[in-house]
């Protein structure tokens, strides 16, 4: 049952309290609601100051770093090889995690708690009265496992102390292995199956219980539980084989030839510094992979050199093609074992799309809509080529696109140079402050910087932001680890460390004796909810003594994107943790985050925060507008490329039996046929599909981001484009999309927010309609 542990960056949960609870209760809503305007204004100003002003941050954080017995290493992070008594609490207020050794104790206590819940579930096999609450018990079991696995996953990515990273790794491995045993438990599956076969009990279930129970049941089936002994053995063998083949594919994922050899004359136009790095004597050795190869395509004047490089860049190694084809055949075998015609059918059954045919309808509609714009963008480059070559019959080839695009952008940038850099208006503090102001206006929630206890965070650069509702008080806790440091993952990400769920009355008495039950909670309308705790990590430059960390526009978009996930975690409050916040369909989960990116470019929202870090003067919007125009020169060409990649993903994970001859699968023919369909350039030999690494990680789901971006664009245009800071629009987004997490059919969510009932049932017509929606 994979729902026993979903990815950490996709969790959330809330909890009610009562006098019988030993949980840590959050501050009363009265502490945050009804504040004097001056206090609220002071809290707002503090957001910018704690990120941008080193002196303010030092004073503000001193309480949490000034423990006498606590030592610091030369890199500035806390040395955790000390006594537990040195700390007021552990990581994320988990008292187990004051030292690395506490991870093992936390894991052991969690497994003991899980064991008690499993015994309750197994008791339902012989005691029918226990079936009624089996689904909520399954959900509690899932929550216990996730709190260890997801916390460990985050610590592995962000903690600077190797001892803690190692402890987290060991905890993750131990709990993941334990979870996999449960995922394939016939006894646990039988309990859940009995629930749904008892019509009297089914009629008593809440909507959420039915949704979660169905998800868990399907996950059990996808894990092969319903197969006979031989089938289960085959299932385990195939999944192991697929994992190994995937690793082989990724490791061999490179062009057939590592470089091409050119003369100095043939490589003319290369950046001088790059040319010097690649030269040996009179020869230039241009790599066929990575950034140097891309830069060479943009710079080399000789078309034959570009053609040679481009063709070699798109010629995959024999090993890569072989690994990919073995991977695809094994996935087909797994799908057939599970009664599906293709791997895409197997994977998409619980997604918005439903099946691969619906995905292709969406992609075809989007491609037809995108193609004219893409051709128009390339026609501009073809005219530049004709002028440059003096040949009116010149045709733009695939290897010409990067070169002439760079020529065009160079001309445009020369005409639009400005003395002020955009980043000077985007300090980390102003951007986070702006996000808080935007959320306050559209959702009635905001950020309040909060001092941390000793031991609560993993590095002194980490800021804690409490997420506060104007009506409910504290509804979530966010830890912002935004600045780069050695050993930290460079990839921006949102992690849900502790998610939201209701704590039921029968749990409260047990919590007083449970060592893992100390969690911050929220009392709301007579219910107790666990407060969600999330962490954001980014890789922004470290603030300087003389100026704050300044962001590029792309980094601003990144922060808005990740905050979209964060707010989904905070507002997606459900009774069951399996469907809270970002725990929804994978082809729906990016909608809130992509939607948030729109606020990073809108003049009205920018006016709330985009100010010069030194003079405090507002951003001249024309400056950003020019930058945005430059970035959009080839937006349809880029979208066309992404659509074709998503189509390739579907084709290769479709019913490929017809392409298997004498036990051998020929992927090249499928790739060639797709390339011939509505092309942008004249045909040329290529086996690039063997270098498309996402075919492993995103198998049959590469379309998801395109679908979510399309839906986000539609929502923005219909609700927010005319009045982006509208509380009415924000309330609709919150009430129809965010608050449901994964407990509502995503098609009903999108139909509700767009007020388009035709979309509510989903299916082929809904997918096609979304693909053809006018977003301009």
Curated annotation (Swiss-Prot):
One Pfam entry name: Peptidase_M3
InterPro entries listed in its UniProt record: M3A_MIP, MetalloPept_cat_dom_sf, Neurolysin/TOP_dom2, Pept_M3A_M3B, Pept_M3A_M3B_dom
EC number: 3.4.24.59
Keywords annotated in UniProt: Hydrolase, Metal-binding, Metalloprotease, Mitochondrion, Protease, Transit peptide, Zinc
Localization per record: Mitochondrion matrix
Cellular-component GO terms for this entry: mitochondrial matrix; mitochondrion
Cofactor note (record): Binds 1 zinc ion.
Cofactor field: Zn(2+)
Record-level GO BP terms: peptide metabolic process; protein processing involved in protein targeting to mitochondrion
Transit pept. (range): 1-28
Residues annotated for Zn(2+) binding in this entry: 561, 565, 568
Active-site residues, record numbering mapped to chain: 562
One GO MF term: metal ion binding
Enzyme class label: hydrolase
PROSITE patterns xrefs: ZINC_PROTEASE
Reactions catalysed, as given in the entry: Release of an N-terminal octapeptide as second stage of processing of some proteins imported into the mitochondrion
Free-text function comment from the UniProt entry: Cleaves proteins, imported into the mitochondrion, to their mature size. While most mitochondrial precursor proteins are processed to the mature form in one step by mitochondrial processing peptidase (MPP), the sequential cleavage by MIP of an octapeptide after initial processing by MPP is a required step for a subgroup of nuclear-encoded precursor proteins destined for the matrix or the inner membrane.
Family according to the record: Belongs to the peptidase M3 family.
Protein name in UniProt: Mitochondrial intermediate peptidase
Species whose genome carries this gene: Yarrowia lipolytica (strain CLIB 122 / E 150)
Encoding gene, per UniProt annotation: OCT1
């Amino acid at each position: 049952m994979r729902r026993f542990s979903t990815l950490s960056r996709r969790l959330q949960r809330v909890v009610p309290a009562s006098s019988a609870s030993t949980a840590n209760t959050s501050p009363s809503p009265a502490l945050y609601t009804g504040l004097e305007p001056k206090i609220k204004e002071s809290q707002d100003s503090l957001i910018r100051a704690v990120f941008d002003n080193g002196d303010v941050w030092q004073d503000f954080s001193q309480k949490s770093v000034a423990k006498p017995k606590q030592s610091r290493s030369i890199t500035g992070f806390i040395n955790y090889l000390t006594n537990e008594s040195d700390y007021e609490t552990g990581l994320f207020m988990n008292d187990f995690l004051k030292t690395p050794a506490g991870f093992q104790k936390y894991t052991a206590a969690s497994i003991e708690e899980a064991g008690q819940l499993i015994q309750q579930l197994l008791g339902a096999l012989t005691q029918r009265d226990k079936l009624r609450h089996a689904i909520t018990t399954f959900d509690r079991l899932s929550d216990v496992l996730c709190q260890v696995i997801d916390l460990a996953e985050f610590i592995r990515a962000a903690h600077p102390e190797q001892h803690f990273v190692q402890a987290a790794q060991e905890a993750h491995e131990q709990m993941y292995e334990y979870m996999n045993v449960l995922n394939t438990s016939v006894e646990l599956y039988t309990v859940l199956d009995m629930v749904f076969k008892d019509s009297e009990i089914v009629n008593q279930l809440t909507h959420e219980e039915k949704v979660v129970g169905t998800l868990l049941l399907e996950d059990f089936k996808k894990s092969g539980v319903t197969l006979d002994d031989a089938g289960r053995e085959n299932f385990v063998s195939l999944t192991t084989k697929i994992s190994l083949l995937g690793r082989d594919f990724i490791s061999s994922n490179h062009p057939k030839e590592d470089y091409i050899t050119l003369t100095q004359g043939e490589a003319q136009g290369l950046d001088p510094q790059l040319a010097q790095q690649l030269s040996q004597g009179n020869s230039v050795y241009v790599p066929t992979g990575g950034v140097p190869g891309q830069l060479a395509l943009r710079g080399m004047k000789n078309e034959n050199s570009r053609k040679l490089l481009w063709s070699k860049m798109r010629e995959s190694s024999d090993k890569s093609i072989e690994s990919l084809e073995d991977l695809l055949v094994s996935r087909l075998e797994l799908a057939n074992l599970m009664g599906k015609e293709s791997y895409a059918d197997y994977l998409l059954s619980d997604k918005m799309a439903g099946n691969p045919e619906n995905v292709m309808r969406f992609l075809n509609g989007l491609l037809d809509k995108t193609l004219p714009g893409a051709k128009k963008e390339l026609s501009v480059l073809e005219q530049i080529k004709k002028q440059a070559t003096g040949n009116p019959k010149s045709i733009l080839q695939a290897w010409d696109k990067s070169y002439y695009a760079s020529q065009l952008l160079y001309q445009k940038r020369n005409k639009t140079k400005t003395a002020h850099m955009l980043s000077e208006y985007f300090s980390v503090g102003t951007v986070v402050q702006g996000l808080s102001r935007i959320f306050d206006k559209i959702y009635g929630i905001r950020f309040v910087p909060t001092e941390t206890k000793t031991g609560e965070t993993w590095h002194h650069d980490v800021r804690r932001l409490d997420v506060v509702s104007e009506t409910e008080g504290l509804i979530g806790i966010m830890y912002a680890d935004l600045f780069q440091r050695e050993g930290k993952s460079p990839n921006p990400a949102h992690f849900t460390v502790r998610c939201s769920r209701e704590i039921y009355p029968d749990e409260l008495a047990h919590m007083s004796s449970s060592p893992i039950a100390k969690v911050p909670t929220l009392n709301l309308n007579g219910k107790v909810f666990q407060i969600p705790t999330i962490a954001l990590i980014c890789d922004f430059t470290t603030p300087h003594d003389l100026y704050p960390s300044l962001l590029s526009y792309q980094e601003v978009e990144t922060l808005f994107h990740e905050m979209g996930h964060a707010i989904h975690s905070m507002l997606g409050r459900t009774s069951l943790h399996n469907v809270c916040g970002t725990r929804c369909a994978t082809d729906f989960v990016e909608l809130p985050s992509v939607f948030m990116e729109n606020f990073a470019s809108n003049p009205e929202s920018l006016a709330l925060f985009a100010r010069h870090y030194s003079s405090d003067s507002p951003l001249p919007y024309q400056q950003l507008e020019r930058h945005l125009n430059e970035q959009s020169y080839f937006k349809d060409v880029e979208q066309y490329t992404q659509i074709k990649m998503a189509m390739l993903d579907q084709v290769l994970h479709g019913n490929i039996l017809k392409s298997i001859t004498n036990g051998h699968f020929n992927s090249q023919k499928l790739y060639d046929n797709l390339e011939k369909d509505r092309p942008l350039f004249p045909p040329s030999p290529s086996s690039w599909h063997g270098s498309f690494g996402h075919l492993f990680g995103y198998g049959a789901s590469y379309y998801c981001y395109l679908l979510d971006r399309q839906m986000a664009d539609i929502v923005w245009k219909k609700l927010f484009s005319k009045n982006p800071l509208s509380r009415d629009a924000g309330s609709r987004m919150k009430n129809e999309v965010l608050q449901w997490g994964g407990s509502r059919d995503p098609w009903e969510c999108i139909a509700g927010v767009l007020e388009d009932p035709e979309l509510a049932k989903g299916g082929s017509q809904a997918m096609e309609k979304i693909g053809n929606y006018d977003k301009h």
